[in-house]
Amino acid sequence: MRVAFCHPDLGLGGAERWMVDAAKEVQAHGHHVVVYTGRHDPKQCFVETNDGTLDVHVAGTWMPRHVGGKMHAWCAYLRCAVVAWKLAWEAWRKRRPHDVIVVDQVAFVVPLLRLWTHARVLYYCHFPDLLLSAPKTALHRAYRAPIDWIEETSTGAAHKILVNSHYTQDVFRTTFRTLAHVETHVVHPAVDVPKTLTTREDAWMQLETDENNQDVAEFCRRAKHLFLSLNRFERKKGLELALEALEWMHQNTSVDGDDLPCLVVAGGYDPRIHADVQYNMELVDMQEKAQSKAHVLFLHNVTDTTKHALLSCCTAVLYTPTFEHFGIVPLEAMAREKPVIACNSGGPMETILHQKTGFLVEPCPSAFAEAMQALTSDPSRAAHMGRLAREHVQQRFSRAAFGDRINQEIVDLAKESNQ
């Protein structure tokens, strides 16, 4: 069976991680897989998209991302339309039609692909886009109205719709009123559970052997307790909460000197996006004024190898977004025996077991800090929670189970076209 994936931008986010994992698993089940995208930067992508594991085709890079800082959504629609056209054109030109096309993030291309191909189209909804761009003025509402209508109508054109969590499923039903009757299936993302774990000491050595990570290795070595935030440098991710929680601990604890906890804030960063550049500057400025400034390290666009080493070094992971649609980071952390402290809303409510594999707390500095203190004051508890976390991920969120599920959804959809 021939399966194509259509994704707008192959960066370093959770949606991209899902797409890469899904494509790899479908390919592992014996199907021919090809990925089409509107952007693929070899310096800001997952390794599988750049080492030959996946067959990646890029189109529409010549199109602008915005017009004078405006019209981002319309530009994204047009760029994705070019990607969809290339997908359809190459399939027709090579006389190798696709059986199923998997689309995510930009539903606009769903009806186009149905028009230009004979493939069955599966749409994976990470979260309704219209809720991510709440209109602030009457003019903005007028601008968003046709975009929101297109999103809802285009989503409904898919032959099958999958969502990433029960939380997103509920939001989908209340947001897309005209699609309330449409059946959706929850397919949670998954992570690799490593067979063996890297010790903290080995992780230090791994960082030290990389000339680009000398400072990182030194920072991690001097931290008796290291907390790690893994998220894109975007305002909606609430990274300032991690900084504020660390500052709260520094100001409200009797411990001082080298025994004070440290924090690494790492994640994807796109210097082309003005809002992200501005947010990054605000975070740096905020930390420069903090009492805990020497105990924080910012890292942009870390490699998977560095990320895994940081996970091995840390005491726990801080996951700061509120009402996150799903959140792959908690799974990545728990798979490596690290408890997670997250906000008590959205997707993490489905993945983290409170006081067993981590803590689900209010999104305020004191609540996060108290959970952090519970782990630093009792290392054996942190280790025990980590072991439970790994078992939890193995049982419910393994890559193998995810692969079987996504493959079955695609196979079932392909069979429908023959009935």
Language-model segment annotations:
Residues A4, E208-K237, L243-W248, L263-V265:
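Conserved donor-binding/catalytic core segment of Leloir-type glycosyltransferases
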Residues F5-L12, K24-A76, T168, P271:
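N-terminal strand-loop element at the rim of the active site
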Residues D129, H140-I161:
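Membrane-proximal helix-turn-helix segments that form the acceptor-binding/catalytic region
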Residues Y167, A190:
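Carbohydrate-associated surface elements
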Residues T322:
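Aromatic "clamp/platform" in nucleotide-sugar-dependent glycosyltransferases that forms part
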